[in-house]
Amino acid sequence: MSRTASGKNGTWRNWGGNVAARPVREVTPASVDELAEAVRRAAEDGLKVKAVGTGHSFTSIAATDGVLIRPQLLTGIRNIDRDNMTVTVEAGTPLKRLNLALAREGLSLTNMGDIMEQTVSGATSTGTHGTGRESASIAAQIKGLELVTADGSVLTCSEKGTEEERSLFAAARIGLGALGIVTAITFAVEPIFLLTAREEPMPFDKVLADFDELWAENEHFEFYWFPHTGSTNTKRNNRSAGPRKPVGQVSSWIEDEFLSNGVFQVAQWVGRAVPATIPTIAQVSSKALSARTYTDIPYKVFTSPRRVRFMEMEYAVPREAVTETLRELKAMLDRSGLRVSFPVEVRTAPADDITLSTASGRDSAYIAVHMVKGTPYQGYFTAAERIFTAHEGRPHWGKVHTRDAEYFAGIYPGFGEFTALRDRLDPDRLFQNDYLRRVLGA
């Protein structure tokens, strides 16, 4: 187990560059026992403890001035159980590595988010999700968890455990790092399958008018709306018998790298320097991506490269409220004078039973707003958040928001159960930081 200062001048920064922390020490445990020892030693020294993955959260959920746990040595697959169709993986394993390993075994997760750079524990602990009629959240695919609690104990929990274990399982799948440090996750898997993706432009008004039909007819539907235009780019993913027809290398480079990252990055720079050009840039951007259809294994369809750095806010609203919420967002932008060069992303998720999941107990739709890194975003995000919260929106735990414990107590029926469990597992708040103090209370 190594102990070092964190980053340049002892400073850790997140991917978005908006969160920085200076931990007293950084620990890289090579085993669960070493991690438990690091937790016990931090408690003895009176220091707070947080684990950090790849830093893709825009909130300070992983920041600490105490002990920062780096899980990069806690990686790899522990076990594949083909009888029960599960895989148990070390918590620091990047999703990309997990997907590649599963594919080699002829297996796959059921759903994924937009990217796969995050660690499995970081992605699940913050509620990372994709889009889907019957599936979306990565955490909802969890069948079992192992975590180290504040006293250094190693606990396991699953949906088939004791009543106490089931209570922990319901909360810890999206535990925000508040209940302990996750060390291993058991996911449900299935035989690898093919998805056919159909991407095509569609007018904004038509998408909203046909939204219920588009959602019902597709296993995975999402779209991007370009502010200052009436245009969207839609994506429909559905299971396919094949044959496999991946995007060609040239087409992939043009669409996913040159247009979606290279040219898009330049357009963002121009828009940031000369905001008056943004409506024109938006019109051009909305027409740049052409319709295409391709068929491939799941992670190659669900995920795509994201190299343009940005800031993001995302809220889950009741699915039946999404079209009205989007109309209000568009009306706000039309009258506000704000200039937004980044598309708005819209996805869906079915209700689940995870205590602090943004889809807990209700079918949900996600609306994500973005601004390129370095561009003032507060005015846009504040106005958008006002609209989202008016529809009982639940913010993504790892994305920008201003909500606090009082708000969450009103929109999560199980909020009190979660905080009571936290009181039992971490009474001295070893895993506390400023973010958790705000969203969960002292």
Task: Give residue ranges: language-model regions.
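Noncatalytic alpha-helical scaffold of FAD-dependent oxidoreductases
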Residues: 1-442
